[in-house]
Amino acid sequence: MSAVALPREQTRVWAEMGEQPEVLGRALAANEPLLDRLRTLAPLRIRLIGHGSSGHAARFGAAVVEARLGVPCDVVPAPDLGGGSALYGGGDLVLALSQSGRTPSVLSAARRAVAAGAHVVALTNDPDSPLAASAHGSLSCHAGEEVAVPATKTFLAQAALLLALAAGTGVASRALAPIAAALEARPAGVPGGPLRPGMVVGSRSAAPIAAEVALKFAEIAGHAVLGVDAAEALHGPVAAGDGPLLALAARPDLNLDLLRAHRDVVQPALPLDGSGDADADALVLAVIGQIMALDLALACGRDPDSPPHLSKVTRSA
């Protein structure tokens, strides 16, 4: 690591992280009418589409929606590998996630879902995007322009809106105060310097959050690290690497206890003792992970706003 760390305040990504409590409150309030209507649809199945950070938000959404609403819910892989319109049906609610609303593969999959008779809702930061125009309705992140390449406030808005769909706006809004406290506290990971984790693990709805935080370490800090479910880590990944495990969990977890028998585990504390809801706490843990990735990037003298080889809109098949 470089001995000279750049100030957070000189980075765009830190400014955008700091906007997250306001963005969350705005997104939840503005989208409540459509969320109410979606809760009355009673679909036979809910399918989500997304890549990258939007894919991680989709996985979080699938976990909380199925657990809380009891509706079969899954994420279409890659995002619709090989299945085309056959992956969707007339009884489906399809949630298509793309922060820009312009990811070609997500847009194509959403159009195929519409053609198959599914009810398609876009979840994007651009209500005038092609994805929003192709869908029957659109949930907006209301995040304003996100300039830094790594998604922070748009990811959080997507995940929070999916939690609000599953559990109500009141539950999702419980994350606001702990998130604001986390940004004020600026956790630095471990004493003695920023954390360079050997793996990021999460339990329950925090498992996809672990994957997102691992992506932030890669994008922001240039540190490639695996992000997996804590139970899955015990089935092989625990043997890889030699750094401490960054554990994202809001509640005691047997799998984390088992991992501690093999590896050093760092588990960040939740500000204000958390939100009182494990799924809302997962959103708080996402923000803590973002900050920890930024701390590592700045200690390394890396520009966190413009990672090499990446752009804001990613073209993929």
Language model segments and positions:
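Cofactor-/ligand-binding subdomain signature composed of acidic, glycine-rich
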Residues: 1-44, 149-150, 156-175
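Conserved phosphate/anionic-ligand binding catalytic regions in large, soluble enzymes, centered on
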Residues: 10-13, 56-61, 212, 286
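Short acidic loop-to-helix transition motifs that present clustered carboxylates
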Residues: 32-33, 77-83, 230-235
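Glycine-rich phosphate-binding loops that contact phosphosugars or nucleotide phosphates
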Residues: 41-186, 203, 238-278, 283, ...
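Short helix-capping/linker segments at secondary-structure and domain boundaries
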Residues: 69-70, 166-174, 291-306
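ATP/pyrophosphate-binding catalytic subdomain of soluble kinases
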Residues: 183-227
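Structured C-terminal subdomain patch of bacterial secreted/periplasmic proteins
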Residues: 274-300
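A short, charged, Gly/Pro-tolerant segment at domain boundaries
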Residues: 303-317
